[in-house]
């Protein structure tokens, strides 16, 4: 079904120190075309499993792996790329065997079933792993590399390509501003949706992506990779400003009155973050202010911010959001969690939204917090008055409460003891809260 609401679903929100018990490493999927297809940004180890761990949705609105048509990689660090090959193996299906194998292979489409965009090296990375693991698939894929002026193109000679690989494009940046404009394009519900990209400063080469509509309502989603300075993206993030800016906040200074265990000074935290090419929340807020972002979500969160007990953890996340919000000055910033969904509705009167889409925009389930156990499943949240969130977001949601039915999900029961948490029973899991074992 066509929909006029753009959505972004976070599959992994941890920094490179993850995964943790509650956060997978980086990946998100965006529905920007309105036709049900998804564009993925980054694909950490475990991303495939994140599709399976999503909580039950009564209206089946959860993103599905089969919907992924494009993958955009920001940089070549392991916490952003190690899930690509498992995704490809599942999306493109194994080579058929048996008496009908030849007939089935003859039906293989010559054009690629999935397109991958990324920096120099991504083509060799995927090709090498597929070859070394003797992986053969039923459908094809293609890799387009976004190259800086000093980069060398990776050969697409048939002798070196994987059997399922189609020759991709070598897309060099503009000589003037170093940007990649209109690297991809597809038909959206109001007209073409175009992908632009730009270099951002990290300790290694890194790219930020912008998905933008070329017709009204001119929505724009800016997804930055790891960075301590995304200023080169400014030209792509104005006129119009982003409807949604997703910016990393890998570390933050938390005052001791909020977290008594916080011992690092602000200067030490900032120095280390910059040395590693990462941002603090106020840096994310400052860039959001510069480009006039309408919504700001903090992503790629460090383990120090996510692995506290309930009361402290809530206050820490609230403090991270406060720091970014204060620097932004145009709205309330939100810290992402796994399976959080952000909706960007259309303002077109000719495209009325369904009730489910209205719920997606207007309602929110708080970030999961359990006072008595770990973890908590979605079916528990619906009936629990103790599930709380630091200032629940008005535009961020995992799903509306009405989309989950009591009894559909199951949880694993734990109890605290001196050694941490002891498991009593294990069943199908929902979304876990962000508290690590003691």
Task: Name every feature range the model reports, one short phrase each.
Residues 75-80, 202-203, 247, 275-281, ...:
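Histidine-centered active-site/metal-ligand motif
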Residues 270, 294-307:
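Conserved strand-turn element in the central/C-terminal portion of the radical SAM core barrel
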Residues 69, 243, 294:
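Conserved acidic residues
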Residues 1-223, 228-235, 255, 303-438:
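Binuclear metal-dependent hydrolase catalytic cores
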Residues 283-296, 326-331:
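A structural motif corresponding to the C-terminal end of an alpha-helix
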Residues 245-247, 296-300, 332-337:
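Conserved active-site loop/cleft motifs that coordinate metal ions or position small ligands
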């Amino acid at each position: 079904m066509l929909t006029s609401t753009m959505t972004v679903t976070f599959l992994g929100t941890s920094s490179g120190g993850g995964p943790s018990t509650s956060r997978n490493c980086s990946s998100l999927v965006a529905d920007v075309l309105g036709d049900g297809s998804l564009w993925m940004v980054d694909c950490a180890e475990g991303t495939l499993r994140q599709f399976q761990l999503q909580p039950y949705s009564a209206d089946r609105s959860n993103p599905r792996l089969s919907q992924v048509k494009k993958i955009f990689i920001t940089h070549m660090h392991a916490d952003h790329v190690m899930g690509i090959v498992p995704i490809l193996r599942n999306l493109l299906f194994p080579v058929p065997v048996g008496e009908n194998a030849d007939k089935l292979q003859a039906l293989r489409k010559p054009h690629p079933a999935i397109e991958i965009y990324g920096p120099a090296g991504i083509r060799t990375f995927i090709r090498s792993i597929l070859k070394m693991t003797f992986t053969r698939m039923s459908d094809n894929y293609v890799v387009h590399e976004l190259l800086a002026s000093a980069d060398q193109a990776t050969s697409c000679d048939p002798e070196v390509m994987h059997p399922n690989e189609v020759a991709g494009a070598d897309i060099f940046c503009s000589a003037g501003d170093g940007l990649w404009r209109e690297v991809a394009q597809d038909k959206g519900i109001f007209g073409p949706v175009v992908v632009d990209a730009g270099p951002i400063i990290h300790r290694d080469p890194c790219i930020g992506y912008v998905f933008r509509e070329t017709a009204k309502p001119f929505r724009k989603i800016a997804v930055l990779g790891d960075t301590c300075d995304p200023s080169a993206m400014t030209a792509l993030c104005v006129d119009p400003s982003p409807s949604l800016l997703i910016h990393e906040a890998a570390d933050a200074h938390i005052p001791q009155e909020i977290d008594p265990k916080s011992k690092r000074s602000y200067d030490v935290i900032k120095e280390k973050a910059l040395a590693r090419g990462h941002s603090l929340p106020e840096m994310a807020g400052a860039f959001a202010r510069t480009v006039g972002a309408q919504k700001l979500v903090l992503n790629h969160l460090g383990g120090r911010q996510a692995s506290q007990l309930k009361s402290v953890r809530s206050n820490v996340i609230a403090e991270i959001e406060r720091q970014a919000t204060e620097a932004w000055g145009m709205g309330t910033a939100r810290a992402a969690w796994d399976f959080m969904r952000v909706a960007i509705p259309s303002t077109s009167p000719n495209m009325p939204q369904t009730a489910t889409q209205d719920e997606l925009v207007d309602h929110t389930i708080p970030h999961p917090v359990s006072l008595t156990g770990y973890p908590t499943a979605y079916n528990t949240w619906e009936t629990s008055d103790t599930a709380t969130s630091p200032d629940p977001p008005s535009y961020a949601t995992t799903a509306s409460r009405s989309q989950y039915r009591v009894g559909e999900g199951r949880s694993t029961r734990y109890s605290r003891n001196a050694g941490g948490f002891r498991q009593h029973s294990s069943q199908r899991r929902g979304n876990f809260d962000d508290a690590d074992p003691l």
